[in-house]
Design a protein with these regions (language model features):
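Active-site cofactor/cluster-binding pocket
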Residues: 1-106, 110-112
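Acidic-glycine-rich active-site phosphate/pyrophosphate-binding loop
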Residues: 1-4, 37-38, 70-81, 117-130, ...
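Short beta-strand segments
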Residues: 5, 164, 187-190, 226, ...
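Gly-rich Lys/Arg/Thr-decorated short loops/hinges at beta-loop-alpha junctions or inter-strand turns
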Residues: 47, 71-88, 103-108, 127-133, ...
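Flexible, low-complexity linker and terminal segments
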Residues: 92-96, 100-106, 236, 241-499
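Short helix/loop capping segments that flank catalytic or ligand/cofactor-binding pockets
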Residues: 112, 121, 172, 197-198, ...
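Short hydrophobic alpha-helical runs that function as membrane-insertion/retention elements
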Residues: 112, 138, 160-162, 186-189, ...
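Thiamine diphosphate
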Residues: 117-214, 223-244, 397
């Protein structure tokens, strides 16, 4: 709290009580480094019709607020506004709009979906860009058909995607497995909402992580991404296509209802600097030794590549004729159910995840760990990560040693990265907006870490103070090293007053 005598300054220095709000603006400017010249431009635009005298008076009020802060207050927090980057360099987008723009920037050519809250607007935003680029948008009869169409379009050579929410993701489970089995690249955007069943269609939750990671019968390679902001949604959409195309597998991108409607300003993406990855296509002219041809048959699922990635054939290419089927198959795509072929083909498919972890994983992990012996290390994802960043800043300004890790690639998991981060902190806290603590459970399953899980599931995101409060609670209770906690543990009966 910073006390500033706004009324006194306005009355006695400026001689105009009505300027109290401008004095307050000056105080905020002094405290948080707001752009003075931009504010003066706004004052001039607002008051110029009332004459130069009024404009000058408001300038004085602004300066008076700034000067009071400089001369009388000691700043106790670490917050300030970054220098403005200029309106011409800024775009303002909602989360779903950023996803749509990112998918188009990645080269998306086909979009099929069935309308569902809160994912519908992804299609609304993407349609104009697709039409302009001779792409296709199709409203399917249901979510099952929409993913089937996207897989078919991808098999035909197009970069393809669908978008849905939790109920639709449930319906897509079999075709997610089909995309993994056939090694077909496809992007699935899941704008999460409160479940199960119809749940609360317009409310926020991070409840679909288990389904994204494990959904479908059997086991397939897949990647699961989660942006942490609107700006991040643009770039993670590009990365979703890059991973799908490079590793020929389904990639699920988890966002949520709150982020889908949230508008943010961020620097205009420079499309020329984006790294765009395209799939490996069979080219008979490059395959001089005919490594991928045996007995006149194209080896779509050849077993001899070190990373499991084999060239895809485009329908119509007489040199790359093959079948696509959900049945297990041998190298030339003919169905087979021999134990040895099954084992070899499973190993081939999962080699791709090994390559992903080796070549691409690290850039998806943001680690903010300035302390070697932090009081608490926080790991979290999605919108909760964005909120946690503000809480971490506040906690550090109070002298607490807090490290943080924000994974954007939630599956596969590179265990040693989590283990390395955990060594820098005495305890690990994982806040999430779901009941089980889904990321916390995955971390426990894949690593030796035993985190403290903090969960809310009321249909709303955390606020930064709630992250601060759980950290304060843990600092007061040093004996707590693991377990699951909810607001009731922190606030008692008052917890329900937060809802």
């Amino acid at each position: 709290v910073y006390p500033v005598p706004l009324s006194d300054i306005a009355k006695n220095q400026i001689k105009a009580y009505i300027t109290k709000n401008i004095v307050a603006l000056g105080a905020l400017t002094g405290l948080f480094n707001l752009p003075v010249e931009s504010l003066k431009d706004s004052i001039k635009a607002k008051f110029s019709r009332k004459g130069e005298k009024i404009v000058s008076m408001n300038y004085q009020a602004l300066e008076a607020g700034i000067n009071y802060v400089k001369e009388n207050l000691v700043k106790k927090d670490g917050f300030e506004f970054p220098p403005p980057i200029g309106l011409k360099d800024v775009v303002i987008m909602e989360g779903n709009q950023a996803i749509a723009k990112g998918c188009v920037a990645a080269g998306c050519q086909f979009y099929a979906a069935y309308p569902i809250t809160p994912a519908t607007s992804v299609g609304n935003y993407i349609v104009e860009d697709l039409i302009r680029k001779d792409g296709w948008l199709y409203q399917a009869e249901d979510e099952i058909a929409s993913l089937a169409m996207a897989i078919g379009a991808s098999f035909a050579g197009a970069k393809a995607m669908t978008a849905t929410s939790g109920p639709g993701l449930s319906l897509m489970s079999e075709f997610i497995g089909y995309a993994g089995m056939t090694e077909t690249p496809v992007v699935i955007v899941d704008v999460q909402r409160v479940g199960p069943a119809t749940g609360m269609p317009t409310k926020h939750e991070q409840g679909d992580l288990y389904h994204a990671v494990y959904g479908s019968h059997g086991e397939i390679p897949r990647a699961v991404l989660a942006p942490i902001s609107v700006e991040d949604s643009f770039y993670m959409a590009v990365e979703a296509f890059n991973l799908a195309e490079k590793y020929q597998m389904p990639v699920i991108m988890l966002t949520d209802a709150a982020m889908s409607l949230r508008a943010e300003a961020f620097p205009t993406p420079d499309l020329s600097k984006l790294n765009i990855v395209n799939r490996l296509i069979y080219n008979s002219e490059e395959d001089k030794e005919q490594k991928f041809i045996r007995h006149g048959r194209f080896l779509r699922y050849a077993l001899f590549t070190e990373d499991g990635i084999t060239p895809m054939g485009i329908p119509g290419d007489p040199n790359a004729i093959h079948a696509i089927t959900g049945l297990e198959r041998q190298e030339n795509s003919d169905p087979r159910n021999r134990p040895d072929i099954r084992t070899y083909q499973m190993n081939k498919r999962f080699k791709k995840l090994e390559k992903l972890l080796e070549e691409d994983y690290d850039r998806f992990i943001e680690i903010d760990a300035p302390y070697k012996d932090a009081d608490i290390g926080i790991i979290t994802w999605g919108l909760t990560a964005s909120i946690t960043k503000e809480a971490v800043q506040r906690l550090r300004s109070r002298g607490l040693k807090i490290n943080a890790m924000y994974p954007r690639l939630l599956w596969p998991v590179k265990e040693d990265v989590f283990e390395f981060f955990a060594k820098s902190s005495k305890r690990i806290l994982i806040p999430e907006t779901n009941y089980y603590g889904q990321l916390a459970t995955i971390v426990k399953d894949r690593t030796h870490i035993r985190p403290i899980s903090y969960n809310i599931y009321r249909g709303e995101p955390f606020i930064p103070k709630e992250i601060e409060d759980i950290v304060d609670f843990l600092m007061e209770n040093q004996e707590i090293t693991e377990g699951r906690f909810t607001p009731e543990h922190i606030y008692g009966e008052k917890a329900y007053g937060l809802i």
